[in-house]
Amino acid sequence: MADDITQLGGADQDVVERSCADVTTGEARYLMALLDMQREAGEAGPSQASLARHLNVSAPTALEMLRRLRVMGLVQDEKVRLTPVGTSAALVLSTRRRAALAIMQDVLGLEGEDAEHEAAWLAASASPVLGRHLISWRAHGPTS
């Protein structure tokens, strides 16, 4: 399966990378969680309550973050669903997370929740340059 980021190109990739660069680590965490939950829930999508439970935050905290993401144009107004731009940004972050998880497990020897947590943090906080290198490393392996 090709990485989701390779499907983007030119101006679209610039917009998505800028979107990823403009989000905080917390916002990125919500985007990745929403993408994962949308994949699991299908068309219905997650509820605000299920998102809060998934992220282990209070309902008011989740509601406030969803408001912020809506203002940024990353989450739909009427549902707890990503917009097309939000989906693209979440796909980039998710691809980074998979690459970072491979590094955590294969290179650093971390396992389980520790590896997942560190990979999500690295994916969310990576600059566009580091994000591209993470994805390239996963696709092609380390360079000499």
Predicted regions and their residues:
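Amphipathic alpha-helical dimerization/coiled-coil segments
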Residues: A99-H140
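Short alpha-helical segments that sit at the start of domains
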Residues: A2-L31, S94
